[in-house]
Each structure stands twice: as structure tokens, then as C-alpha cells.
Curated annotation (Swiss-Prot):
Documented EC number(s): 3.2.1.18
Source species taxonomy: Bacteria, Pseudomonadati, Pseudomonadota, Gammaproteobacteria, Vibrionales
Organism: Vibrio cholerae serotype O1 (strain ATCC 39315 / El Tor Inaba N16961)
Signal peptide interval: 1-24
Keyword Repeat: yes
Protein's name in the database: Sialidase
Family: Belongs to the glycosyl hydrolase 33 family.
Cofactor: Ca(2+)
Pfam families: BNR_2 (PF13088), Sial-lect-inser (PF09264)
Assembly mode: Monomer.
Cellular component GO terms held in the UniProt record: cytoplasm; extracellular region; intracellular membrane-bounded organelle; membrane
Length: 781
């Protein structure tokens, strides 16, 4: 069988000095007028004619076509598939597309039979000259076209979907004509097109016919964790990624080595170039593992930027074996679509991985106090580098034996960063821009012995001067100060200086990166811990991880204050030390510099003084809504019930500021997806836009077997036509093992899916979204 599209692509890639491999089960005949391949036989098809049936190349309409002349005999062309190809078609579906016109008669039959069954549409011109279709095993005819349109060229499509009740849908010029067509019994084993009857004459001209089997393998198990993006500037260029798992395990096991691999297609996912290892150049001695490739396609530069995590080879996120002092981090590589070149990996760990001492005053208070010998008759200065994560009562205090100065930091209801100063009634708004509210800031107190006042500076900018309050205390303290008010703060530095001498110095940024041999316990370092109720404190973060799936480039931020169109952003998994959460990592300059947003707001409840009941969002994906909001869907690992509320295996969150902060969408969890697997697994979400500008969301996840039960089987596809409020479907895409998946728009009609299937083999599905959509919208009418 000649794979015409494969050969064309191979020739093009050879011109660029690139290798290619033929994966796609795509069988076609194309009447190009090429003298070398001008007949079906020369393109690999078997002639199956009887009596006077024949075929000939014609240019009668000014374009080449193969004229099927079933006059006085059958005139059809066939190709027989292998057992493996039949099995693949049964498990992953197939699509048959024909561009032809019927000139006279009937019994024009373009179909596929797998040895046990077939779906057989019969195209004819009826006695009134109308173009009609009927289906084997079903009654009635459907008129497709009348008048002169009946004998013009049209597109006929059959789309077969697998499942417990497999069926096909028939489309005419892109419109759904018949759904849920059940196969009929047949012993034939072939793809067939032409006039299929020796007793009924029929003449048709074929410009093109394609038969495509879904589910070609592009990465083989034990490799895992697929992701995929497609270029919108250079149509047809698709880049796929996975973890190369030599040894077969998750990262962080001595028994295996993990790297990041990629393959590229330049014909929409039909053929793929050879596998390329992106990380072996920075992993020559196999001392690290790399995981979770997260690509972002940037249309402004026509590049793909893929981020991935680095781990020590003996510890990673799973099992919380990774520790803050271990060499976890994030790297990225850039692929230039036009040239086909990859840049060397770039390390951005210092930009995105936080090193700090973290205090969560959730249900209690936790302060650290250090007695000092400040002299109120001399100037002094304190510096603190702090990030306010949430809540209030987050405090810095300096007392010099005469007066004390207290700065209490909080996030107010509007999301702004606010300071309250002791002895001053009015709060001070320090920052209202969300991107800066949740960042680390330098808080400096400068005491004037002459005036007995202190001036507050934030990031070097003078904010105010105040007198504080009379106090005989002589100390410095920080933490969450009120057991009745929740708050979380992260500290990187505390320094107290007088007369050029550091009286107190706490370098949490440094200590968070040190091994246990270095003393880090604040109480052993001279601090007094003052704790009430339930709190949590730790050095972190242990790890940051891009997670599986693709990231996005923002394009709909016109309605958002501080428009950030062009922002590259993805949801990353962060492990503080004990719990997983998700935060956005983003770049506003094409990837040169990266910042982090806040973590997802999650409910919690202390079950005891040492057991915190909360959610742990992990693998997540996001999509930009039409109004500029970002919708994030996250897998919930481990616990799913907090304070009696079942949040299910999946929860959605919303951002109204370009991914900086998030809100939990009540009751918007896995339950909005009917017949979804109850197991935890990575999913995928994306936006799809048609050529007419209409748009909707797509979501893929296993359904389970049967649907709605626990298990990684039977990948489903859901549609949302109201920006993620409700979801229609699922449409089953895979029959059998289905784990992680990623879906991305390929063109104005199709999306491409990569999914883990049997034995972790990662397969490609090229799905006709505009056709499948009609299966749902038709049922609503």
C-alpha cells in the first residue's frame, strides 16, 4: 500500500535534512494528474471489476478525477488490512472521507469491512435525479441534494467511534445526516470505493478518497506523560513530548533514568520525525531525572517553549521524598518552528522555586521572638523580606526598650496588600496590583533616635513615619500573631542592625537550601517560639514541577485590568514540604523572565493538633475564557473530603487577573462531567475556534469501564458551549486502556489528541471536532 501523504512528507523533510518515520495508517487515492501515480493501481489499490466495469483518469472539469464506470459490471477498488490494523481501527476508530460526484445510476459504495462487520452507505441518483443515501441494515432514504447540485462534487464522510456500542456517523458536506449507524455483519476484509454492484449501473468521478485509522503509536511504553501543541502560523506542524523512562518508573528511582523526548510532525500528525532527547546533554552521567514536559506554543515568535522538571535520581515528588535542599528545579527548551532547530536547555529554577521559612497560622498563631540589646538612643534598622500568601495578622515587630513598632500585613477583601501600624488607626494600601501583592517584598524599618520615630520603606519606597507605642520590650519578632485570624506568610530574611553591627540575622533563603547537617531549627538558633492553637511551619519549597499537559498564550485579556496578552502561562505543581498545591508560572517577555502567581485557595480543617484535613490539587490544566478569565481544572490527590464536603477527584478554579490569583468554583468539580471516571488522573482542556469565529471548550478524561466508575479506561471527550459552566458528552474516543491525555486544536475543523493507552503506548487521535460536535448539538434540537 502506498502512503502517498507519507511519501510527500518524507520528500519535504529530506530536503531539509530531516528524518521521518511513517506512523499513520492513512490510505488514500488522490487524482493529482501525476503521470507516475495517475491510477488507483499505481497508488496501491487492487482493481476489483467485473464484466465491463472500468475506470479512467479524466480532466473533464478542468481538474483530474478518477472516473468509475460501473456500466455493465462492477467497478471498484479495494485494499485489505492486516489483523493489527483491524484491531487498531476497532479500539481507536476510523474516518473515511470522499470527494466525488455521482454522474448517473447508483450503488456507489465507499466503506470499510473488517472481516466481521461493515458500515455501508449506498449513494445513488433516484428516478427524480436527486442525490440520495441509504444504509445497509436500515430503512429509508435521505435526500442529500437536488437539481444541478445532485451531480456536483460533494464531500462524503464516515466517522466510526469505538466503545461498548460502536457506531458510525455519516456527514454530507460537513453536515451530520445520520448518527449511530450500527454495523452489519460481513465477512469482507477491505477498504472499498467505487460502484459495488454487477447488476446496478453507476458512474462517479473521484477526486480524492482517504481512509484513516486513529491511534498510531508515536511513543512506546514504558515511556509516559504525553503533551502536545500545534502551530497556528505554520499549519500542520505539531510537536509532541513525553518522558523517556529507561527502567520504566516514575522519576526519583535509582532503578531508572528519565529524560524528556520529543517528536515533530509537519503534516498535521500523519507522519513524525525521529525521536529527539532534549535533556541528555545536561544529564550525561544520568545523575538526574527529568519529568513532566509542559509545552506552550507562542504564535508571536512561532516557537514552542517546553518546560520540564529536574529531580535528583533518588528522590522526587511522589512519596514526598524530595526535600528543599535537593536539586529540584525547572528548565525549558525552545523549538523554532520555521528552522526546525532546538535551543539548549535553560535553567529558570531561581526564578520560580521559592526558598523560605513558611508559617501557616490556620486555626492558630505562631510567632518567633528574639530578645535583643537595642539602644533607643541610637538609630537602628530592620530589614525583612516577606511574602504574604493569604489572610491577616501577619506581623513584623521591633521593640527597642522604649517603644515598639508593629507592622501587621494582610490581604484585604479586594485582594490588595495592606499594612496596619500600631498606634495608627487608618490602614495603608501598599499594593493593589495582584501580580505584585503576592510577591516577596522588602520591608525596612528605619528608626530615628533624634525623633523617636520609625519610617517604613517597602521595596525602597518610603511609605510613612510613625511613633509606635510605649513599651519596655526589647526584641524582634515575626509570624502570625492572632489565633482567631488565619494568615500565612513566607520569610526569606530577617536582619536587625545597629551601629553597623548585625544584632539579629535569619537567612531563611540560605537555610532552606541546606542539608540537615546545618542547624535550621529557629529555637536552637536563639528564637523563642510562641504558639497557640493549630499551625504549620516549615522550610520550603521542596519542589516545583510544571506538571503534564500544555500551557497557553493569553490572547483575550482586553477586559482585564493591566492587559497581559501574549503572556505565556501554565499551572505548576508545588510541594511546600507536606502538601501539594498548584500555582501559575508565567512570562510576559516571551520566556526570558518568569514569575509565579499565588497557590490555589483550598479548604482545610484541623482534625487534631497534628492532622490537617485539606485538598491537594496536583496535575492541572487551564484554558482562557472568552472574557479573559482563566479556568483551571485540577486533579485532587489523596483526600477529597474536607469538613464533610466531597470535592470529588477534580475541582475547577477561576482567575480574573490573568492567572495571578484564583477562586474555588463551588460545586464545579468532577460532577459537571457526566459519566467521568471516579479515579484520579491527569486530564486536558482546551479552546476550539471554528472558521466562522464560533468557539467552545474541549475536555478529555477517562470515562471508566463502565462509564462513571473508577478506572483508567475508555477516553472520553466533553464539549462546553457556555465557557465551562456545563459540559455535554462524553463522546468515547478510545475503547480500552486510557490514562493521561492532552488535546490541542489542529486547524479550524480538527483537534489532535495524544493519549496513554495499552502498555503506556502513547497514541495520536486526529479528531474531526466540527463533525463530532454535531452529535451533541443535533440531539439538543
Amino acid at each position: 500500500m502506498r502512503f502517498k501523504n507519507v511519501k510527500k512528507t518524507a520528500l519535504m523533510l529530506a530536503m531539509f535534512g530531516m528524518a521521518t518515520s511513517s506512523n499513520a495508517a492513512l490510505f488514500d487515492y488522490n487524482a493529482t494528474g501525476d503521470t507516475e501515480f495517475d491510477s488507483p493501481a499505481k497508488q496501491g489499490w487492487m482493481q476489483d471489476n467485473t464484466n465491463n466495469g472500468s475506470g479512467v483518469l479524466t480532466n473533464a472539469d478542468g481538474m483530474p478525477a478518477w472516473l468509475v464506470q460501473g456500466i455493465g459490471g462492477r467497478a471498484q477498488w479495494t485494499y485489505s488490512l492486516s489483523t493489527n490494523q483491524h484491531a487498531q481501527a476497532s479500539s481507536f476508530g476510523w474516518r473515511m472521507t470522499t470527494e466525488m460526484k455521482v454522474l448517473s445510476g447508483g450503488m456507489i459504495t465507499n466503506y470499510y469491512a473488517n472481516g466481521t462487520q461493515r458500515v455501508l452507505p449506498i449513494i445513488s441518483l433516484d428516478s427524480s435525479g436527486n442525490l440520495v443515501v441509504e444504509f445497509e441494515g436500515q430503512t429509508g432514504r435521505t435526500v442529500l441534494a437536488t437539481g444541478t447540485a445532485a451531480t456536483e462534487y460533494h464531500k462524503f464522510e464516515l466517522v466510526f467511534l469505538p466503545g461498548s456500542n460502536p457506531s458510525a456517523s455519516f456527514y454530507f458536506d460537513g453536515k451530520l445526516i445520520r448518527d449511530n449507524i450500527q454495523p452489519t455483519a460481513s465477512k469482507q476484509n477491505m477498504i472499498v470505493w467505487g460502484n459495488g454492484s454487477s447488476n446496478t449501473d453507476g458512474v462517479a468521478a473521484y477526486r480524492d478518497i482517504k481512509f484513516e485509522i486513529q491511534g498510531d503509536v508515536i511513543f512506546r511504553g514504558p515511556d509516559r506523560i504525553p503533551s502536545i501543541v500545534a502551530s497556528s502560523v505554520t499549519p500542520g506542524v505539531v510537536t509532541a513530548f513525553a518522558e523517556k523512562r529507561v527502567g520504566g518508573g516514575d522519576p526519583g528511582a535509582l532503578s531508572n533514568t528519565n529524560d524528556i523526548i520529543t517528536r515533530t510532525s509537519r503534516d498535521g500528525g500523519i507522519t513524525w520525525d525521529t525521536e529527539l532527547n532534549l535533556t541528555e546533554q545536561i544529564n550525561v552521567s544520568d545523575e538526574f531525572d527529568f519529568s513532566d514536559p509542559r509545552p506552550i506554543y507562542d504564535p508571536s515568535s512561532n516557537t514552542v517553549l517546553v518546560s520540564y522538571a529536574r529531580w535528583p535520581t533518588d528522590a522526587a515528588q511522589n512519596g514526598d521524598r524530595i526535600k528543599p535542599w535537593m536539586p529540584n528545579g525547572i528548565f525549558y527548551s525552545v523549538y523554532d518552528v520555521a528552522s526546525g532547530n532546538w535551543q539548549a536547555p535553560i535553567d529558570v529554577t531561581d526564578q520560580v522555586k521559592e526558598r523560605s521559612f513558611q508559617i501557616a497560622g490556620w486555626g492558630g498563631s505562631e510567632l518567633y521572638r528574639r530578645n535583643t540589646s537595642l539602644n533607643s538612643q541610637q538609630d537602628w534598622q530592620s530589614n525583612a523580606k516577606i511574602r504574604i500568601v493569604d489572610g491577616a495578622a501577619n506581623q513584623i515587630q521591633v521593640a527597642d526598650g522604649s517603644r515598639k513598632y508593629v507592622v501587621t500585613l494582610s490581604i484585604d477583601e479586594s485582594g490588595g496588600l495592606v499594612a496596619n501600624l500600631n498606634g495608627v488607626s487608618a490602614p495603608i494600601i501598599l499594593q493593589s496590583e495582584h501580580a505584585k501583592v503576592h510577591s516577596f517584598h522588602d520591608y525596612e524599618l528605619q528608626y530615628s533616635a533624634l525623633n523617636h520615630t520609625t519610617t517604613l520603606f517597602v521595596d525602597g519606597q518610603q511609605i510613612t513615619t510613625w511613633a509606635g507605642e510605649v513599651s519596655q520590650e526589647n526584641n524582634i519578632q515575626f509570624g502570625n500573631a492572632d489565633a482567631q485570624i488565619d494568615g500565612r506568610l513566607h520569610v526569606q530574611k530577617i536582619v536587625l542592625t545597629q551601629q553597623g553591627h548585625n544584632l539579629v540575622e535569619f537567612d531563611a533563603f540560605y537555610l532552606a537550601q541546606q542539608t540537615p547537617e546545618v542547624e535550621k531549627d529557629l529555637e536552637k538558633l536563639g528564637w523563642t517560639k510562641i504558639k497557640t492553637g493549630n499551625t504549620m511551619s516549615l522550610y520550603g519549597n521542596a519542589s516545583v514541577n510544571p506538571g503534564p499537559g500544555h500551557g497557553i498564550t493569553l490572547t483575550r485579556q482586553q477586559n482585564i485590568s493591566g492587559s497581559q496578552n501574549g503572556r505565556l502561562i501554565y499551572p505548576a505543581i508545588v510541594l511546600d514540604r507536606f502538601f501539594l498545591n498548584v500555582m501559575s508560572i508565567y512570562s510576559d517577555d516571551g520566556g526570558s523572565n518568569w514569575q509565579t502567581g499565588s497557590t490555589l485557595p483550598i479548604p482545610f480543617r484541623w482534625k487534631s493538633s497534628s492532622i490537617l484535613e485539606t485538598l491537594e490539587p496536583s496535575e492541572a490544566d487551564m484554558v482562557e475564557l472568552q472574557n479573559g478569565d482563566l479556568l483551571l481544572t485540577a486533579r485532587l490527590d489523596f483526600n477529597q473530603i474536607v469538613n464533610g464536603v466531597n470535592y470529588s477527584p477534580r475541582q475547577q478554579f477561576l482567575s480574573k487577573d490573568g492567572g495571578i490569583t484564583w477562586s474555588l468554583l463551588e460545586a464545579n468539580n468532577a460532577n459537571v462531567f457526566s459519566n467521568i471516571s471516579t479515579g484520579t488522573v491527569d486530564a486536558s482542556i482546551t479552546r476550539f475556534e471554528q472558521s466562522d469565529g464560533s468557539h467552545f471548550l474541549l475536555f478529555t478524561n477517562p470515562q471508566g469501564n463502565p462509564a462513571g466508575t473508577n478506572g483508567r479506561q475508555n477516553l472520553g471527550l466533553w464539549f462546553s458551549f457556555d465557557e465551562g459552566v456545563t459540559w455535554k458528552g462524553p463522546i468515547q474516543l478510545v475503547n480500552g486502556a486510557s490514562a493521561y491525555s492532552d488535546i490541542y486544536q489542529l486547524d479550524s475543523e480538527n483537534a489532535i489528541v495524544i493519549v496513554e493507552t495499552d502498555n503506556s503506548n502513547m497514541r495520536i487521535l486526529r479528531m474531526p471536532i466540527t463533525l463530532l460536535k454535531q452529535k451533541l448539538t443535533l440531539s439538543q434540537n
